[in-house]
């Protein structure tokens, strides 16, 4: 069997790739591996608003109960709520059923350990090994030793209280627009901002099981950008389906992506003496403009591979407090152990409130270098072609020479989809747009 786990848990089209049988096996193996030797272990289970969540939850919970563990079901809550509540409730593990920003037909299963961190590759491999062994030596308890399913009704309330407590200030006087992507933030974000005193205006907060991420949320912020201006809001926030990421919109309707949010928060925290080692952790996909802004503000940058797990690894290894990605995955390690869209939105809103500056003013700390991202569709087994094909390698070198130190070419395979992402930065938008499309077309042609 090829590796089950991708960069963010197990993902696939629900009911064909990610089947109820696989969910049961993951629940059974995951509960066994993560709770070995624990007396009556407790595992949290939550989901986003996808229609397939009910089916997968039933199967996953059955697997957990089959090894004698308790399943504490939280219902629909954001992914970061699982990370936080696993710690807060003293659970042995947490599981989120979500495919994040992916379309509705996809779903995923992601595990957290007892500290609220995503699993290491070694633990994921051990879960897969147990499944492939046919559950060799895994107990099948009977009678009173079986696990029970418990519905935890206070989960959403507990998460909202935690998120609100991260800012310690009223947001009264702020007009805030929220795009909930018809996903897991549709209650948590709305209630948190309202309870903090903000006047809120909400779109895409009516999930029906099939409309999650559909032309809305952080992957499609255009509607929010217009809505913020129309409603004369001070700012807006767009979440993805499971609310582990967040993008902002300023009062003029401009998008404020993860790079801007990171730079704004890093500058503010540094001024308060709360940015550990004056260092911000980012990935290779962050805009060169962020690097320049940080240099001007005397903020160090630590650069990792793409993926919030690599950002987190660097933060934990060096004790850094802030890191994230352009996509809006922002980790405030003083608050949570994973990217948290609601916590991110609240930090930005509180900075606007405390400084008295508009979000448009705050984002002027950074100037974006034009950046183009083009997806090349490639089979999963050919994702490394850009490192192996001589013509593609030569074309990349030619483009790098043409950019002459004022830009860059970055190519990376997607961890969750049959895509290779081609990213170019440079001073001339039209030029890099053409170069990126040419390179993506070349990669696709070589694969077909």
Curated annotation (Swiss-Prot):
Binding site residues for Mg(2+): 100, 240, 242, 244
Annotated GO MF terms: magnesium ion binding; phosphoglucosamine mutase activity; phosphomannomutase activity
Record's cofactor remark: Binds 1 Mg(2+) ion per subunit.
Enzyme class: isomerase
EC number: 5.4.2.10
Cofactor requirement: Mg(2+)
Reactions catalysed: alpha-D-glucosamine 1-phosphate = D-glucosamine 6-phosphate
Mod. after translation: Activated by phosphorylation.
Active site location: 100
InterPro entries: A-D-PHexomutase_a/b/a-I, A-D-PHexomutase_a/b/a-I/II/III, A-D-PHexomutase_a/b/a-II, A-D-PHexomutase_a/b/a-III, A-D-PHexomutase_C, A-D-PHexomutase_C_sf, A-D-PHexomutase_CS, Alpha-D-phosphohexomutase_SF
Keyword line: Isomerase, Magnesium, Metal-binding, Phosphoprotein
Phosphoserine: residues bearing it: 100
Keyword Phosphoprotein (UniProt): yes
Gene3D superfamilies in UniProt: Alpha-D-Glucose-1,6-Bisphosphate, subunit A, domain 3, Alpha-D-phosphohexomutase, C-terminal domain
UniProt keyword Signal, yes or no: no
Superkingdom of origin organism: Bacteria
HAMAP family membership: GlmM_B
NCBIfam families: glmM, PRK10887.1
Database matches in PANTHER family: PHOSPHOGLUCOMUTASE (ALPHA-D-GLUCOSE-1,6-BISPHOSPHATE-DEPENDENT), PHOSPHOHEXOSE MUTASE
Function according to Swiss-Prot or TrEMBL: Catalyzes the conversion of glucosamine-6-phosphate to glucosamine-1-phosphate.
Protein name per UniProt: Phosphoglucosamine mutase
Biological source species: Clostridium perfringens (strain SM101 / Type A)
Lineage per the UniProt record: Bacteria, Bacillati, Bacillota, Clostridia, Eubacteriales
